Amino acid sequence: MKTLWMVLCALARLWPGALAGCAEAGRCCPGRDPACFARGWRLDRVYGTCFCDQACRLTGDCCFDYDRACPARPCFVGEWSPWSGCAGQCQPTTRVRRRSVRQEPLNGGAPCPPLEERAGCLEYSSSQSQDCGHSFVPAFITSSVFNKKRIIQAVSPQWSTHTKDAGYCMEFKTESLTPHCALVNSPLTRWMQYLREGYTVCVDCQPPAMNSVSLRCSGDGLDSDGNQTLRWQAIGNPRCQGTWKKVRRVEQCSCPDVHRFIFI
């Protein structure tokens, strides 16, 4: 078969236009396009009508020079934009970041990755710079990683210098949770998969989630006797929620990182 192919190629040199293909026709088309064809040798070594569209790989009727004339080019995207502010004030909502396409995929190249990401957030200052957002029940929690990105004075200017380091940790024993916590798989919500029934978790109460007057976090359960069932909800996935009971208050959280969260 290889010898026959070499003979055909040699004969083609004596037959003008026999090796016409995508390059000579100047064609490279997306998807399936019956009008995107040329006359020449196909990759399956049949001479006749051959195609220069993206679907020819599946149908096996590409022109012999398709790979060279129409190389696959993957999608290229730019860098992520900075995170936006919260979409609303004084209530659980979302923030967003986006990136743009620098080059669309061509000729079956790798598709574009997600161009938008959302994450939960809660602002504690209204448009009139009034302290707010502390009256929510149940307790709203998120990953402790988010705590590193909170800027105290920008969110709540009422905090004085000597109270910036105020805070405490609440330990809870998880009683129940919805199955939706284990179904999320984005980088920003993966922490929810570590919530488990019967586990003890730690939740930090830090500014700005801490009320600047009461020095408490909403939903901290500090006043419960330990037998009261309290409710919590994960920021970023409202269907991830459940119940827990207070274990104790401590000054510093000592749980493993995957079982350490913050009030928000």
Curated annotation (Swiss-Prot):
Residues 24-75 form the SMB domain. Coiled coil: none annotated. The gene is Sbspon. InterPro entries: SBSPO, SBSPON_C, Somatomedin_B-like_dom_sf, Somatomedin_B_dom, TSP1_rpt, TSP1_rpt_sf, TSP1_spondin_dom. Pfam families: SBSPON_C, TSP1_spondin. Keywords: Disulfide bond, Extracellular matrix, Glycoprotein, Secreted, Signal. Glycans are attached at N227. The keyword RNA-binding does not apply. It comes from the Eukaryota. Residues 74-125 form the TSP type-1 domain. Disulfide bonds join C28-C36, C28-C52, C36-C70, C50-C52, C50-C63, C56-C62, C63-C70. GO terms for cellular component: extracellular region. It is found in: Secreted, Extracellular space, Extracellular matrix. The keyword Chloroplast does not apply. This is Somatomedin-B and thrombospondin type-1 domain-containing protein. Belongs to the thrombospondin family. The lineage of its organism: Eukaryota, Metazoa, Chordata, Craniata, Vertebrata. Residues 1-20 form the signal peptide.
